[in-house]
A protein has these predicted regions:
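Short, conserved sequence motifs used for protein processing/export or organelle targeting and
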Residues: 9-122
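Conserved redox-active cysteine motifs that mediate thiol-disulfide chemistry
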Residues: 1-3
Length: 122
């Protein structure tokens, strides 16, 4: 997985949740239980690992399959842009703000935007 994510750095951003199975003492799970439980319930995760791309679950987890799916989704333009602003005034502080800009009139009525701040090496 890391190989293909390196190839798509700056275009594809992984969000990895650590669940309470098979090991309920996983330190990442213990630190972030409410959010992980919320995501497991939202996506209906029955087992791990599991991959969701733009929401729906994606089952064909091969390098070529992921590459094709990434390329397919990257070819679809987004109706919104997210501009982020980062300030690091001190070594122990990071301030982040976001602007969400709609480039098109949104379709649908039950729309939700979920933003995540992640730590990743890209």
């Amino acid at each position: 997985m890391d190989v293909i994510l390196e190839e798509y750095a700056g275009q594809v951003v992984p969000i990895r949740y650590h669940v309470w199975w098979p090991n309920g003492s996983d330190c990442f799970w213990l630190f972030n239980q409410p959010e992980v439980t919320d995501r497991v319930d939202y996506y209906g995760v029955p087992a791990v690992p599991q991959i969701h791309i733009d929401g729906p679950e994606y089952n064909l987890v091969t390098y070529d399959g992921l590459r094709a799916k990434f390329d397919e989704r990257l070819a679809v333009s987004s109706p919104i842009r997210i501009a982020n602003f980062v300030q690091m005034p001190y070594l122990d502080s990071v301030y982040v703000s976001f602007d969400v800009i709609a480039d098109e009139e949104p379709s649908g009525t039950d729309l939700r935007l979920r933003l995540a701040v992640t730590e990743w090496r890209h």
